Amino acid sequence: MRIIAGSLRHRIIEMTNLETTRETQDKVRGAIYNMIGPYLDVSCCLDLFAGSGAMAIEAFSRGAKHIVLNDLNKNALEVCKKNCKTLGINDAEFYNLDYNDFVKQDSHKYDLIILDPPYKMDDISSILDSVYNLLDTKGMIVFEMGIESKFPDEYKDLTLTKNKTYGIKRVVVYKR
């Protein structure tokens, strides 16, 4: 797997090789960042279900000043740490928490929140509710889910701006 664009373009990162983690493939990751690129002004990015960290690392490569990576799986988090170390990313924080526990203890505001939970977690509104207060006033949420998942067109003051499918994956983007 490689970084698509930005200061770390073409650099290779390690994948997790875990059955419980679905990596966002290069093509899809590139399409997502092409979708949100015109609106992307990121100081701080949260990847709540980080896996290998590819999505947050891509944000860093494209200008994010600080990334926060969380994954419940310790092995996945070790891959995140290794990838950041290999790429020389020092402005990163790592957490090994259930997403609800992370949200309860975090008080930062994020310009970009990336959500790619296991597809069996199909209560999209509940996940949006849990991260809502972490989103900055002009922030954006990128939510990857199974193609069959139901999601709201609007959520509180968030507006659905993109809805694309890639094979068995759906990507929706909410903006505040």
Positions of predicted regions on the chain:
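Class I S-adenosyl-L-methionine-dependent methyltransferase catalytic core
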Residues: M1-R176
